[in-house]
Amino acid sequence: MISANNVTLRIGKRALFEDVNIKFTEGNCYGLIGANGAGKSTFLKILSGVIEPSKGDIAITPGQRLSVLEQDHYKYDDYQVLDTVILGNKRLYEIMKEKDAIYAKEDFTDEDGVRASELEGEFADLNGWEAESDAATLLNGLGIETDLHYAYMRELDGGQKVKVLLAKALFGNPDILLLDEPTNHLDLDAIAWLEEFLINFNNTVIVVSHDRYFLNKVCTHIADIDYAKIQLYSGNYDFWYESSQLMIKQMKEANKKKEEKIKELQEFIQRFSANASKSKQATSRKRALEKIQLDEIRPSSRKYPYIDFKPNREIGNEVLHVEGISKTIDGVKLLDNISFTLGHDDKVAFVGPNVNATTALFKILAGEMEPDEGSYKWGVTTTQTYFPKDNTAEFTSEDSIVDWLMQYSPEKDVTFVRGFLGRMLFSGDDGLKKVNVLSGGERVRCMLSKMMMSGANTMLMDEPTNHLDMESITALNNSLIKYPVVLLFTSQDHQFVQTVANRIMELTPGGLIDKQCTYDEYLENDEMARKRQILNMEAEADD
């Protein structure tokens, strides 16, 4: 068990947390939620001891081991992948290295023998004999193939490093597991594997995530941060939402009844306070009036941007025809003879672990990259807008947000642009920020603003939910459900994909799988699973 006792954290004059008391117990998974800036990641750092609270303390059951998902992707560059995972249990790793050093000695002494015996006992107690196989199981489950297990971390790309660091956090059955955005940069297959792992994990988990489906799947409780307090709810994310809305509704109804009672008492007092025969009753009602306290109902600190895509023209029946597109980058064949045709009602989600292939295809269709072979043709009634996964190149200038967005605005009017930005949660002086210093979430909101202004009737969106908070994801999700024309997108947010897409495509090493269905139907379809397996086997045979 881990608990926060009267924890207060002040940053300058602001209290990020004020007298927080909460217990996280064994066998439960707690989803830590709150608006951007509420302090979710900071609270995890307080629990792990990285940040010292201004007041109060953190208590952990003696002897329990705490494990944290680390965010530094370069810290273990000089370690092999398998060793990095085993470092999740630092004591076990130290024992393994000390044992190896002793047994490598040429002049093995009696003292060495005694020490080796001690180490072997501790090694066995920590399940050391299963360490490498357990680490390999975690890596394979997350999609890190066996041939990479003995590679050095510096040889891996960013997405692979994220998976290794996650495996490190999960390794060795920790008593308390702290996970900050564990689904970031994971493909949907890896997320599904992590969901099953956490569902079957018997110890304490505290997780921060913007993935609503993930929180619904794994959480037994929700800890909601708002106004420097943390309120604990039993149940998953959807249950929290319904419970919190019901609580507010009940408080409003109770306040309404109290206000009616106050009005009734005030009218009686005003009418009869000067009446000698009624003075006792008036005095009694004054006392009753003084006892009535209205519940304080604070509006949630959560804010939702206004996202609404409106095409400027209707789209015809001919939308997009792709014929035999192939692309190899750095010696890796990402696209192999890909062909498909889009209709005017298609909302296509590209799924599967081959995210680089999807990015390459989107760049080709957006005109930013040439295919090695094949061709594509957009319909004459289509207008396209593109959301790249990496938007760095869009934000290198010294322009303010207002000036940056003005380039894409149909109305060259500062008041119009500021109003538009206000709906996207850039208020007051936010519009004067230089775009080259914006956070990831701010950049995404700028890109979405640009796309809304385009009035396009066809959208390409490569991971638009990355860097967004839950409120912004919800707003984008609802907008794309309503979006009346063609959409090609990819996202690692299960609920986002399930509620938006009506057609699923998967770019496998052996070719394209294409199915007109929802994402859940695709996952449950045995025929699609067999087809995926056959295509992967054919690709391996060709290699």
Write out the residue ranges for each language-model feature.
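ABC ATP-binding cassette signature C-motif
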Residues: 1-255, 309-543
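Short, flexible cytosolic linker that couples an ABC transmembrane/permease module to its adjacent nucleotide-binding
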Residues: 298-314
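A structural signal for long alpha-helical coiled-coils and helix-turn connectors
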Residues: 103, 241, 270-273, 277, ...
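Proline-centered turn/helix-capping motifs that create local helix->coil transitions or kinks
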Residues: 130, 277-281, 291-301, 377
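ABC ATPase nucleotide-binding domains
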Residues: 251-265, 271, 278-287, 303, ...
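Short amphipathic coiled-coil heptad-repeat segments
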Residues: 136-142, 267-271, 287-292
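Extended non-transmembrane interhelical loops and adjacent amphipathic helices
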Residues: 113-116, 186-187, 283-294
